[in-house]
């Protein structure tokens, strides 16, 4: 299994690297994994781009220091602060029409196992009006001024092409207030219900405030003991 670490020098180049990796998995039949911290950005899903308030939402993101981009998978807008960890598990598939649900279910279990290894009591689910709402999300009790409440830590998406499937997602490590602050006007412009208090983080759930540790935990859970070769992308300014 190929383990790809680091990120490319620009957001566009970084997204291109993942697309190229998906094609390489389809061509070679060798699975691959990435777990890294993307550049600071606000990534909109394809549904967002069709909303009447899309340009207003892009402006709100830009005003708050989050360059807006569009991602190829579905789902709603996601904010990356620079400490947010993304992951992508890429596997060859013989039939692109089957296995979708099984891959989603397995991915939830993998994220829960990774968070468990970091001391977090995570489970499948999400509180109401969460960011990027979906059936395959992970939540955990997070510290608040009034005690603890379940908050969303991770969301999962999937893309399938001829010969390969990519299950990807995002895990909020820290900066939950900043994420809530930028997503609030963005989701409002898109007409999507959103509660900023639904945003959790690994740190608020009692785990490490360290994106490198979170990335390696996700990587280890996805690899699951398989033999690996480690490769690095080109941005020397970031290890993860």
Predicted regions, residues:
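Acidic, polar-rich N-terminal leader regions of halophilic archaeal proteins
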Residues: 1-240
């Amino acid at each position: 299994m190929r383990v790809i670490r680091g990120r490319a020098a620009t957001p566009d180049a970084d997204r291109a690297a993942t697309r190229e990796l998906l094609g390489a998995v389809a061509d070679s039949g060798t699975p691959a994994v990435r777990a890294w911290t993307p550049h600071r950005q606000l990534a909109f899903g394809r549904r967002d781009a069709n909303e009447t308030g899309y340009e207003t939402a892009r402006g709100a993101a830009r005003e708050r220091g989050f360059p807006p981009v569009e991602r190829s998978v579905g789902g709603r807008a996601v904010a990356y602060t620079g400490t947010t960890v993304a992951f992508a598990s890429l596997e060859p598939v013989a039939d692109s029409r089957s296995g979708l649900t099984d891959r989603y279910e397995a991915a939830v279990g993998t994220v829960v196992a990774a968070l468990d290894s970091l001391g977090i009591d995570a489970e499948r689910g999400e509180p109401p009006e969460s960011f990027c709402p979906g059936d395959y999300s992970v939540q955990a009790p997070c510290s608040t001024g009034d005690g603890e409440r379940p908050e969303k830590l991770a969301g999962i998406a999937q893309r399938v092409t001829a010969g390969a499937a990519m299950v990807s997602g995002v895990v909020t490590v820290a900066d939950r207030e900043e994420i809530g602050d930028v997503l609030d006007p963005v989701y409002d412009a898109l007409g999507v219900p959103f509660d900023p208090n639904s945003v959790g983080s690994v740190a608020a759930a009692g785990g490490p405030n360290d994106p490198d540790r979170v990335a390696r935990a996700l990587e280890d859970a996805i690899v699951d003991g398989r033999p690996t070769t480690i490769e690095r992308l080109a941005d020397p300014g970031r290890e993860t």
